[in-house]
């Protein structure tokens, strides 16, 4: 999905969700089919939303077919992980995660920081400052980012400029990139999906010394969700950046994340929070399938 960036200024000026709590049910179905069957598979699912100060998980469950041994734990980044193993021959693996969450937009009461203030948090948030190949900006973007930083009085002002720059350049177009595509490759293509837009945004922020992290989750596609109506939702990605507090922004849609966004995982990039990852034993090929259904309950 894409929106229209509404000029310059503070990110808080851009659209966010309503102040009323919204309750959403998310049903995420994913898995693999195996052309010649699999003898066994070992997997991790990151499909359970997090409870935070802005989001409460009321109910959640993860179901695996064929029936599998499983355990739940939290990884280094605080994400809920369901690890499971299937030790019998199977032609397909299906994972269904169903969750009900209630959320409100994140309220930031802390004053924005100055450029000089970033040094004080560089050690604490050093992992979110790394310019690895996944997020490193394209070489052609360097001069633009240098000019933007030089003209920005504060990190927050620079961040707003980055959001507009990335949103204007990267067209949302599925099929142009792959899960392994880097931010620089997507930038050169001029198009990609939410993962690519988030990675490009992270790289531009980190290059200026602003801690920034990748966020994965779900998005209800309607600006005004109808209570009781089930719609095709989206696995989605956005960013959070440090400006006195962690502030979120969805650069694909040019909005501040609100009550239509359901947060599942945070990390340095997509590689820290893939919905489903694992290994399997088969002589043939496999094919991934995914569907997301979202229902507003109230």
What name fits each language-model region?
Residues 48-50, 65, 98-100, 242, ...:
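Structured loops at beta-to-helix junctions and adjacent beta-edge loops in soluble globular domains
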Residues 1-113:
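Intrinsically disordered, low-complexity N-terminal segments that are enriched in acidic
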Residues 45-47, 62, 110-120, 253-256, ...:
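Short intrinsically disordered coil segments
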Residues 30, 177, 252:
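Ser/Thr-centric signal marking residues that sit
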Residues 11, 16, 164, 196-286:
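Hydrophobic/aromatic-rich core segments of domains that either
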Residues 22, 28, 43, 60, ...:
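Structural beta-strand/beta-sheet cores of well-ordered domains, especially the beta-sheet scaffolds
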Residues 98, 138, 152, 228-229:
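Glycine-centered loop/turn motifs
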Residues 109-111, 117-192, 200, 208, ...:
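Secondary-structure boundary elements
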